[in-house]
C-alpha cells in the first residue's frame, strides 16, 4: 500500500516544470554538483529549501550536501528528478528506497510555504487586480478565494495532524 501511494505521488510531481524554460532528460545523481542542478532549474531551489538545505554549497555534490544536512540522498534525488525531468519514471526500487521522514519533512515544509507565503501572495495579487472592479464583484471573488483558501488550509492541516503521523507509524 505504501509503495502504491508513493508511486502515485512521484508520478504526479510535475508542478515545478512551469518554472523552467525547457525539459531535462538526464536524471541527477548523488555525484551531480548541486550548483549544476540549481543552474539547470530554479525549481530545485524550492525543493532543496523545503528539505532544509540552505544555500552556500559551492562545488559540493548532492550526496555531500545531503550528508552534511542529514537529508536522505535517495529521497532528495527522487524529489528533484520527479519534479524537474520530463517524463521521469522512477523504478519501484527507487520509490521503495524513499526515506519517509525526509519525504514528510519536505511535504510539511511545502504546506507551510504554501499556506504562509503563496496563498497570501495570490490573494494580494487578486485584490490588486480587482482594484477597479465593482465592489459587489470584488466581494464575491474575494469571498470565493477566501473559502477556497480555507479548504486548502483544512486539507493541509488534516494531512499534518492525521495523515503524516499515521504514515510515520506504518
Regions found by a protein language model. Give the residues of each.
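Small-residue-biased structural context
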Residues: 2-170
Amino acid at each position: 500500500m505504501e509503495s502504491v501511494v508513493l508511486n502515485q505521488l512521484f508520478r504526479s510531481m510535475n508542478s515545478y516544470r512551469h518554472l523552467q524554460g525547457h525539459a531535462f532528460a538526464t536524471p541527477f545523481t548523488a555525484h551531480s554538483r548541486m550548483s549544476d542542478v540549481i543552474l539547470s532549474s530554479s525549481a530545485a531551489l524550492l525543493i532543496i529549501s523545503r528539505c532544509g538545505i540552505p544555500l552556500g554549497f559551492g562545488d559540493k555534490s548532492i550526496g555531500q550536501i545531503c550528508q552534511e544536512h542529514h537529508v536522505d540522498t535517495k529521497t532528495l534525488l527522487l524529489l528533484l528528478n520527479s519534479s524537474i525531468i520530463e517524463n521521469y519514471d522512477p523504478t519501484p526500487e527507487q520509490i521503495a528506497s524513499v526515506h519517509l521522514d525526509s519525504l514528510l519533512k519536505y511535504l510539511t515544509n511545502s504546506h507551510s510555504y504554501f499556506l504562509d507565503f503563496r496563498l497570501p501572495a495570490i490573494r494580494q495579487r487578486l485584490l490588486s487586480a480587482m482594484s477597479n472592479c465593482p465592489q459587489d464583484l470584488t466581494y464575491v471573488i474575494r469571498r470565493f478565494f477566501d473559502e477556497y483558501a480555507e479548504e486548502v488550509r483544512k486539507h493541509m492541516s488534516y494531512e499534518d495532524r492525521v495523515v503524516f503521523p499515521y504514515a510515520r507509524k506504518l
